[in-house]
Regions:
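Alpha-helical scaffold segments that form or flank carboxylate-/histidine-based iron centers
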Residues: 2-15, 37-60, 80-89, 121-140, ...
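Helix-loop segments that flank and shape redox-cofactor active sites
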Residues: 23-51, 67-81
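Conserved alpha-helical segments that form or flank metal/cofactor-binding pockets of metalloenzymes
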Residues: 49-76, 96-104
């Protein structure tokens, strides 16, 4: 089985951003239900030297749109990093998803060998497209989505693993009662 660069990127990025949107919705609902100023959660951090929730969302969306654009050879949409509320963060995610949906499989054909050159604080970095996607873009998206999840969970938002995983488009999950665990056999009692 071969997996195309498109299959390994665009649908997976969209899936993760939809999960992030669901996580943020639960954060906003939590704040509303408990009378918490939503800005407290949007500005929350896990530790003082870490980025706040808003910045985690900005970086996750920047990585997603930047990764797809570089692999497709198109201009990266520029979003100012000014979001300060849950609705603004949701809008940023929606704009990123809309951009990702504009990328076609044909645009990513052959991108596994495309040169991707980035200028970072540590200096210039060069990747092949495949290495860039699998070792830079995807781990960064997962990291920042996970950190957003952790910030909200740390602040009491009721989130679970399924919130992070999101609704898997190819999965056939049937809701209902969990399967019963088999009863343990007990050794006969000695008299």
């Amino acid at each position: 089985m071969s997996l195309s660069m498109y299959q390994a990127s665009v649908p997976v990025l969209i899936h993760n951003l939809k999960a992030l949107a669901g996580i943020l919705k639960k954060g906003a609902d939590h704040a509303r239900a408990r009378g918490i100023d939503p800005a407290v959660l949007v500005d929350a951090r896990l530790f003082p030297d870490m980025f706040p929730l808003a910045r985690q969302v900005q970086i996750a969306t920047d990585m997603a749109k930047g990764g797809a654009a570089r692999l497709a050879g198109v201009e990266i949409p520029s979003f100012p990093d000014t979001e300060a509320s849950f609705p603004e963060l949701q809008e940023r995610i929606a704009r990123t998803i809309a951009f990702l949906k504009s990328i076609t499989p044909a645009q990513l054909e052959g991108s596994e060998q495309r040169a991707v050159n980035l200028q970072m604080r540590m200096g210039a970095v060069s990747f092949t497209g495949q290495y860039y996607l699998l070792s830079w873009v995807m781990p960064n998206v997962y990291f920042h989505v996970t950190t957003a999840y952790n910030i909200l969970r740390h602040n009491g938002v009721e989130l679970g693993k399924w919130d992070f995983l999101g609704k898997a488009p190819g999965a056939n999950i049937k809701a209902g009662k969990p399967a019963k665990k088999p009863a343990k056999k007990r050794a006969p009692r000695k008299a």
